[in-house]
């Protein structure tokens, strides 16, 4: 059975009207989860010590200090804080860390964290692209530094490159980071020559308009061999579903069945120990359908 971590506080991050990263995304995720036998757990409130594995204390203090008493505070062109944003982000951090703990200790084989705001664009001292804290990078560092794993891997299939995760783990020789993403597209990073300090970063750009066939080719030809060579003890997934053909923010042509195939193949690595965390996905119906197949596979492979 798959563990699913959620918390009502993740709905406290409220974005301005018309913003694509909106609270209704959580309801879409719940529609996707309907009918799947999952074990639900609440995300604990994150430990600041885990955040500090990736972000300096001055950044943490700056985010907390910027939270408004009402309305919104704007951190960059599309990243906002509302009164409940810090609380929501810390629940997402707590969820990824609790999921890592459960999977690493053998309590479960697979887990999915349905938190928000997303995290893969957040750099060490910069909030950007809807993201405050580098949630999945924090989870990887917990696996490495708290559980003393020797090798972990992250696969990020969000349509936008995970520049934050890349920056946070650029010098981390124990973590393989693999990103497939549309290029050119925001944030403009993710070229193949961006390899990390130890050659442990693999960027696989995809052209606008490409679909499931092109995705399968690059995963079979590049991503899966990299994972096999790395032999990770834990696989984390930055699960953004905005490469779907119906997503309004990009131009890839994936379908829900592509996420089913990809999730199933990713579960072949790390002995099937997989922790997935929600990132993007902004068409609500496409998000629900994609979450349904993604978590459905995690449930099947977690038995």
PLM features: what roles do these ranges have?
Residues 1-155, 159-303:
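HDAC/HDAC-like amidohydrolase catalytic core signature
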């Amino acid at each position: 059975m798959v563990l699913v971590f959620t918390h009502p506080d993740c709905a406290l991050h409220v974005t301005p009207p018309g913003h694509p990263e909106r609270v209704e995304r959580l309801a879409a995720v719940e529609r996707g989860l309907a009918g799947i036998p999952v074990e639900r757990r609440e995300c604990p409130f994150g430990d600041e010590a885990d955040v500090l594995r990736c972000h300096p204390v001055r950044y943490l203090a700056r985010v907390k200090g910027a939270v408004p008493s009402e309305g919104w505070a704007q951190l960059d062109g599309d990243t906002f804080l509302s009164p409940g944003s810090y609380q929501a982000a810390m629940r997402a951090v707590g969820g990824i860390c609790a999921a890592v703990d459960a999977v690493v200790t053998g309590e479960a084989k697979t887990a999915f964290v349905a938190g928000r705001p997303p995290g893969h664009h957040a750099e060490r001292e910069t909030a950007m692209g809807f993201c405050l804290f580098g949630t999945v990078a924090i989870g990887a560092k917990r696996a490495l530094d708290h559980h003393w794993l020797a090798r972990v891997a992250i696969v990020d299939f969000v349509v936008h490159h995970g520049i934050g995760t890349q920056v946070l783990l650029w010098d981390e020789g124990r973590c393989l980071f693999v990103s497939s993403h549309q290029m050119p597209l925001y944030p403009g990073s993710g070229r193949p020559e961006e390899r990390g300090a130890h050659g442990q970063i693999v960027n696989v750009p995809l052209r606008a308009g490409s679909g499931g066939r092109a995705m399968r080719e690059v995963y079979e030809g590049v991503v899966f061999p990299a994972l096999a060579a790395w032999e990770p003890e834990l696989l984390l997934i930055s699960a953004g579903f905005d490469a779907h053909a119906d997503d309004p923010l990009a131009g890839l042509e994936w379908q829900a069945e592509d996420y089913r195939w990809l999730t199933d193949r990713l579960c072949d690595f790390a002995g099937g120990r997989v922790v997935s965390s929600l990132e993007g996905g902004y068409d609500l119906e496409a998000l629900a359908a994609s979450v349904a197949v993604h978590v459905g596979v995690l449930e099947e492979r977690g038995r």
